[in-house]
């Protein structure tokens, strides 16, 4: 049985991935519920809600069974989602480029369709694209990080310097946004690089997703 509604996500060896999407995309036999759906059916959680608050280094949390309001700075802004999509998907835009977002804590970077990522990069002064077969990465002067705006339901979320950078290459910072061909639904995958600045609430009971700046 569940003995706590919150667990720390610490630096440790990865031993697998627990899918937290909707049952419509589960890869294993239908007689087995995805882990959070199983917790719901067993009434092991107070509410059909979980919340990710990711932080660089230590301090990340996964709150099960409700919302921990101490993790957010402002009002949580909710958007409706369609469980038939399987993934947690919402409409949005990046630097004014309209698209769809898949919110995925199992992805390290921010990955978007090649054409849209190139369009976004063209709007970021000092950012240089680098092609590699079916993927696209970019670099920038580490002392001049770009300002990248993600907009969801009319609210903007900016990447800070740490979120925008994913290591270095030849003395330049590597942008945490990567382009890739053939992405499903031509959607962006907003992974940890985005979620490190935003606390995200996943509400399976009301089929909605909430966003707020993390405290």
Residue ranges and their predicted role:
Residues 24-25, 57-58, 69-71, 107-110, ...:
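Solvent-exposed loop/turn segments at secondary-structure junctions
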Residues 114-152:
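A compact, surface-exposed functional segment
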């Amino acid at each position: 049985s569940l003995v706590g509604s919150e667990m720390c996500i610490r630096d440790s060896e990865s031993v697998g991935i627990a899918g937290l999407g909707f049952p419509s995309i589960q890869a294993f036999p239908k007689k087995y519920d995805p882990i959070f759906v199983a917790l719901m059916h067993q009434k092991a959680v107070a509410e059909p809600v979980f919340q990710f608050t990711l932080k660089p280094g230590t301090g990340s949390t996964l709150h099960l069974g409700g919302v921990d309001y101490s993790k957010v700075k402002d009002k949580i802004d909710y958007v409706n989602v369609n469980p038939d999509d399987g993934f947690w998907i919402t409409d949005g835009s990046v630097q004014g480029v309209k698209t769809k977002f898949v919110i995925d804590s199992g992805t390290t970077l921010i990955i978007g369709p090649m054409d849209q990522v190139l369009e976004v990069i063209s709007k970021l002064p000092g950012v240089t694209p680098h092609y590699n077969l079916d993927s696209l990465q970019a670099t920038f002067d580490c002392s001049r990080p770009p300002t990248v705006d993600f907009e969801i339901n009319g609210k903007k979320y900016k990447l800070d310097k740490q979120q925008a950078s994913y290591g270095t290459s030849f003395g330049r910072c590597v942008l945490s946004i990567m382009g890739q061909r053939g992405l499903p639904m031509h959607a962006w995958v907003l992974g940890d690089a985005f979620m490190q600045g935003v606390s995200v609430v996943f509400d399976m009971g009301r089929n909605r997703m909430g966003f707020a700046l993390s405290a």
